[in-house]
């Protein structure tokens, strides 16, 4: 990276933080510009909607972290602002003891799952600002997940619902993409890009997606 830090395994330094996504979602238009009342679902103390006022009562934080796309590019020092997922979880969601998995659903129909234990890290945010400006629809506004230790496909954009589950049973990666593209954890440091496929094979395949997956 430009600041001298080593890149994670298999990554190269990208030139800019661009809108990027799977083909079905990269150019999908999301109508909501203003605050969205999140739907809270599944194994929680009380399911329902989470208002902007509830989120606004949580401590706001600003953090600078790196973003790593599973297709092998990285961008250093992206400045995010929002609330910690751990604070949201303890104060608002209050998941039941058996909850172990969280599925994030986007307004664009995208969804992805992460283990609850990974989401409790101090740098996991529900973000609404990036680089000093409102998030905007290009980068997942009005609100998105930011989990710097995990590949970008886990960082769901345009959040509409947060669902707490016991396990991955009944969960599926969005059609038509195969489930093997969705690693159960997706940690960058361990290069958990996909299920079952070796990284020597998946790296060059994913690199081919880079020019095709940038928003037009």
Outline where the language-model segments fall.
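A glycine-rich, hydrophobic loop/mini-helix early in the fold
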Residues: 28-84
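Short acidic (Asp/Glu) patches
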Residues: 51-53, 84-90, 127-130
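Extended, aromatic/histidine-rich regions of cofactor-dependent oxidoreductases associated
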Residues: 1-38, 43-44, 91-216
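Extracellular-facing segments of soluble proteins and assemblies that are Gly/Ser/Thr-biased and enriched
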Residues: 68-108
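Residues that form generic nucleotide/phosphate-binding pockets
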Residues: 58, 88, 208
